[in-house]
Amino acid sequence: MSTAALITLVRSGGNQVRRRVLLSSRLLQDDRRVTPTCHSSTSEPRCSRFDPDGSGSPATWDNFGIWDNRIDEPILLPPSIKYGKPIPKISLENVGCASQIGKRKENEDRFDFAQLTDEVLYFAVYDGHGGPAAADFCHTHMEKCIMDLLPKEKNLETLLTLAFLEIDKAFSSHARLSADATLLTSGTTATVALLRDGIELVVASVGDSRAILCRKGKPMKLTIDHTPERKDEKERIKKCGGFVAWNSLGQPHVNGRLAMTRSIGDLDLKTSGVIAEPETKRIKLHHADDSFLVLTTDGINFMVNSQEICDFVNQCHDPNEAAHAVTEQAIQYGTEDNSTAVVVPFGAWGKYKNSEINFSFSRSFASSGRWA
C-alpha cells in the first residue's frame, strides 16, 4: 500500500472510518484501564466490540482490505509508512492477565507489562521456585534494566541477553549480601517479550515458561523449554561438572534438584552449568494473520497444549476473559501448580473465533472429577 493511501486512510478515510474513530475515542474514555494486577476469575470480562452501522455485528475494515478485528485500535502512522502497510497501535488497556494459585500454599508466579518508550512495549512472566525472591527481583528490576539499555543497544535480542545476565548478576550480589540463606537456592524462569513499532517482536527466555504467537489460528512456539531432556542442555551440565538424576516420576533434574537447565538465580547450581543466558527469537508480525501473543507458566503448559491454548483464547470476547479462561482450564485439567497467562491482542484478534476447538471432552470431564 502506498504512503499516500495510508495517510489518506488514517487521516481522512470514509464515513465508516471516521465513525469508528469516534466510537473508539468514546470507548477509551469510558473503558477501565487494565493494570498489571491479578484479577479474580469472577470479575466481569470486558468486551471491545463495535457495530457502527447498527447491525449488531462486529465492525471490520474488510472494505479497505486490511484486517478483521474486534478490538479497535488507532493506526501507528510512522511505522505504517516505514513498513508500507497499516500497523495498529497495541494499547496496554487491552492486554489480558490472570494468575491462579492452584493447590500451592503460595503463588510464586509474577507477571508484568509496560510501555517503555513511544516505540517499545514490554511483557513478561516469571515463575519462581525455592520461594518467590528471584521472581520478585525480576518483577521489580527487569523493566528498568531494559529501559537503561534501550538507548545503548538497538538490537533487541542482544539487549535482552544483556538484561538477563545483568539481572542475574544483581540478584547474585543481593543474595550473597543477604542474611537469608534461602536466597541462594531461590530461582525463577523468565520469559520476556519486547514489541517495537507494533511489528518487531523479540522474545527471550530461560526455563520453561513459554511464549506462543497465534498465526492463522495455529500456534507458533517462540520459546523452547530448557530442561535436562534436551541433549545440548544435558551436555553442558555434564561438562560443567553437574549431573542429571531422575525423580520417582521419571522427571530429570539437575543435581537431583532443579527441573530446568537455565534460570535466573539458583546460585548453588551456577558451577554445575545452570546459566542465565537466554535463547532469543525475533519475528515480524503479520497483523492480518496474527491474533495474539500469550505468555504462560508451566502450571498451564504441562496441562494444556499449545493448540488448545490458541483455541480457548480464540473463543473469548477479549484478552482479559481469555487469560482467565486459560488459567481456569489448566485447573480443570488438574494442575496443582501456580498458573499465569498474559494475552496481548494483535491485528487479527477475533478473526479465527469460529475455528474448531480440538480438545477432548472426556479428558475435561475426567480431570474435573465428574466421572470419578
From Swiss-Prot:
<dbReference type="GO" id="GO:0009083">
    <property type="term" value="P:branched-chain amino acid catabolic process"/>
</dbReference>
<keyword id="KW-0904">Protein phosphatase</keyword>
<comment type="subunit">
    <text>Monomer. Interacts with E1 and E2 components of the branched-chain alpha-ketoacid dehydrogenase (BCKDH) complex; this interaction requires colocalization in mitochondria. Interacts with BCKDHA but not with BCKDHB of the E1 component. Interacts with the 24-meric E2 core composed of DBT monomers with a 24:1 stoichiometry; the N-terminal region (residues 49-61) of PPM1K and C-terminal linker of the lipoyl domain of DBT (residues 145-160) are critical for this interaction, whereas the lipoyl prosthetic group is dispensable.</text>
</comment>
<feature type="binding site">
    <location>
        <position position="128"/>
    </location>
    <ligand>
        <name>Mn(2+) 1</name>
    </ligand>
</feature>
<dbReference type="InterPro" id="IPR000222">
    <property type="entry name" value="PP2C_BS"/>
</dbReference>
<keyword id="KW-0597">Phosphoprotein</keyword>
<keyword id="KW-0378">Hydrolase</keyword>
<dbReference type="GO" id="GO:0030145">
    <property type="term" value="F:manganese ion binding"/>
</dbReference>
<feature type="binding site">
    <location>
        <position position="127"/>
    </location>
    <ligand>
        <name>Mn(2+) 1</name>
    </ligand>
</feature>
<comment type="pathway">
    <text>Protein modification.</text>
</comment>
<dbReference type="GO" id="GO:0005759">
    <property type="term" value="C:mitochondrial matrix"/>
</dbReference>
<feature type="domain" description="PPM-type phosphatase">
    <location>
        <begin position="94"/>
        <end position="346"/>
    </location>
</feature>
<dbReference type="GO" id="GO:0005739">
    <property type="term" value="C:mitochondrion"/>
</dbReference>
<dbReference type="InterPro" id="IPR036457">
    <property type="entry name" value="PPM-type-like_dom_sf"/>
</dbReference>
<feature type="modified residue" description="Phosphoserine">
    <location>
        <position position="248"/>
    </location>
</feature>
<dbReference type="GO" id="GO:1902108">
    <property type="term" value="P:regulation of mitochondrial membrane permeability involved in apoptotic process"/>
</dbReference>
<dbReference type="Pfam" id="PF00481">
    <property type="entry name" value="PP2C"/>
</dbReference>
<keyword id="KW-0809">Transit peptide</keyword>
<comment type="function">
    <text>Serine/threonine-protein phosphatase component of macronutrients metabolism. Forms a functional kinase and phosphatase pair with BCKDK, serving as a metabolic regulatory node that coordinates branched-chain amino acids (BCAAs) with glucose and lipid metabolism via two distinct phosphoprotein targets: mitochondrial BCKDHA subunit of the branched-chain alpha-ketoacid dehydrogenase (BCKDH) complex and cytosolic ACLY, a lipogenic enzyme of Krebs cycle.</text>
</comment>
<dbReference type="GO" id="GO:1902531">
    <property type="term" value="P:regulation of intracellular signal transduction"/>
</dbReference>
<comment type="similarity">
    <text>Belongs to the PP2C family.</text>
</comment>
<keyword id="KW-0464">Manganese</keyword>
<feature type="binding site">
    <location>
        <position position="127"/>
    </location>
    <ligand>
        <name>Mn(2+) 2</name>
    </ligand>
</feature>
<dbReference type="GO" id="GO:0047385">
    <property type="term" value="F:[3-methyl-2-oxobutanoate dehydrogenase (lipoamide)]-phosphatase activity"/>
</dbReference>
<feature type="region of interest" description="Critical for association with the BCKDH complex">
    <location>
        <begin position="46"/>
        <end position="61"/>
    </location>
</feature>
<feature type="transit peptide" description="Mitochondrion">
    <location>
        <begin position="1"/>
        <end position="29"/>
    </location>
</feature>
<dbReference type="GO" id="GO:0004722">
    <property type="term" value="F:protein serine/threonine phosphatase activity"/>
</dbReference>
<protein>
    <recommendedName>
        <fullName>Protein phosphatase Mn(2+)-dependent 1K</fullName>
        <ecNumber>3.1.3.16</ecNumber>
        <ecNumber>3.1.3.52</ecNumber>
    </recommendedName>
</protein>
<feature type="region of interest" description="Disordered">
    <location>
        <begin position="34"/>
        <end position="55"/>
    </location>
</feature>
<dbReference type="InterPro" id="IPR001932">
    <property type="entry name" value="PPM-type_phosphatase-like_dom"/>
</dbReference>
<feature type="binding site">
    <location>
        <position position="298"/>
    </location>
    <ligand>
        <name>Mn(2+) 2</name>
    </ligand>
</feature>
<keyword id="KW-0479">Metal-binding</keyword>
<dbReference type="InterPro" id="IPR015655">
    <property type="entry name" value="PP2C"/>
</dbReference>
<keyword id="KW-0496">Mitochondrion</keyword>
<feature type="binding site">
    <location>
        <position position="337"/>
    </location>
    <ligand>
        <name>Mn(2+) 2</name>
    </ligand>
</feature>
